[in-house]
Design a protein with these regions (language model features):
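Domain-terminus/edge residues, biased toward the C-terminal soluble/receptor-binding domains
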Residues: 186-190, 198-326
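Active-site-adjacent loops and short helices of periplasmic peptidoglycan-processing enzymes
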Residues: 17, 43-208, 214-219
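Sec-dependent N-terminal signal peptides of Gram-positive bacterial secreted proteins and lipoproteins
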Residues: 25-44
Length: 332
């Protein structure tokens, strides 16, 4: 059909309106795509932890720490930043309690245990030597109080009381500890008790396996850091003789002396010597430093601080968002 001169402007306006509408819908669709990409970017972003060096080879230096075994791990990705003889089996002493805490928080997570549940101390739990909070037989404490006793003061008696409460016996609890360790891929670990007091040669782990279980505890149950970062706190003993206050002081001195330290667990026996798994956070980086068999308690803290300093100075955490950057498209 041939349009008359009068109808041409009207037709043009109709075509223009359709073109404008098409452009409008294209703009809306593009805006939606951009919004969706922006929203889902974090879901697809990969946290990557890399040393700020020309190569990413793990540092190996006998000069960094005195301890015969040690490892430094980034918590979010599990990247090993530094290691020294990290797979030699050694006695962990009270660092054992990290696995005990994992099982406690597993029970809390499943709902079979609550923070305000009460636990009665048995004669066996009371009989524990070493580091303890001096629970009396028949003494009743809440789960939360006993968690504090374990993670702050390294109470062997509190650990056994919790083990018996959860599984009926320490032996059964230890069986679950070994199953949990196997599930985490801790290939060089075997537990004989729930507190690390034993000096049995069949109770062992490695620096690497300790880092693995430390990472499991703090990433799956970050609430533990609320307790492990406490420097001092009082609990109340409630016994037949009455009530009395008892002070807990954190065995991890890095809580006060190292910037960003938020826990985690110390350990020492005549066989294990002095051990430590320390967690520190700065900005978006969380590091786990493990040292085993240091000659004295000062060296374990010095070695852990040295590894943490190395990690925070040499490494950075970034998010891989290349999928949505123009530079990435140009590189392709």
């Amino acid at each position: 059909h041939i349009l008359s001169p009068i109808n041409v402007p009207a037709a043009c306006r109709y075509i223009d309106r359709r073109e404008n509408m098409r452009k409008k819908w294209i703009s809306i669709i593009c805006a939606v795509i951009i919004m969706v990409c922006t929203i889902i970017t974090p879901a697809y972003a990969a946290g990557i932890f890399l040393p700020e060096e020309s190569n990413t080879k793990q540092a190996e230096s006998t000069d960094l720490i005195e301890a015969p075994s040690g490892i430094l791990m980034e918590a979010q990705t599990g990247t090993v930043v530094y290691q020294k003889d990290a797979d030699t089996r050694r006695s962990p002493a009270s660092i054992t309690k990290i696995m005990t805490l994992i099982l406690i928080f597993d029970a809390l997570d499943k709902g079979s245990l609550k923070m305000d549940d009460t636990v009665t101390t048995s004669a066996h739990a009371k009989s524990m030597g070493g580091s303890q909070v001096f629970l009396e037989e028949g003494e009743i404490q809440t789960v939360e109080t006993l968690i504090k006793c374990i993670v702050i003061a390294s109470g062997n008696d509190a650990s056994v009381a919790m083990a018996e409460h959860i599984c009926g016996s320490e032996q059964e609890f230890v069986r679950h500890m070994n199953e949990r360790a196997e599930g985490l891929g801790m290939k060089n670990t075997h537990f004989e008790d729930c507190c690390g007091l034993t000096e049995s040669p069949d109770h062992y782990t490695t620096a690497r396996d300790i880092a693995i279980m430390s990472r499991e505890l703090i990433t799956k149950y970050p609430k533990i850091l609320e307790y492990s970062s406490i420097w001092m706190e009082n609990i109340t003993h409630v016994t037949r003789q009455g009530t009395k206050e008892f002070g807990l002081t954190n065995t991890n001195k890095l809580i006060r002396s190292y910037e960003g330290c938020v826990g985690l667990k110390t350990g020492s026996t005549s066989i294990a010597k002095y051990c430590l798994s320390a967690v520190a956070k700065r900005n978006d980086i969380t590091l786990i430093a493990v040292v085993l068999a240091t000659p004295d308690y000062k060296v374990r803290f010095k070695d852990a601080a040295s590894m943490l300093n190395y990690g925070f100075s040499k490494c950075s955490l970034y998010i891989d968002c290349l999928l949505y950057t123009s530079d990435a498209a140009d590189d392709k």
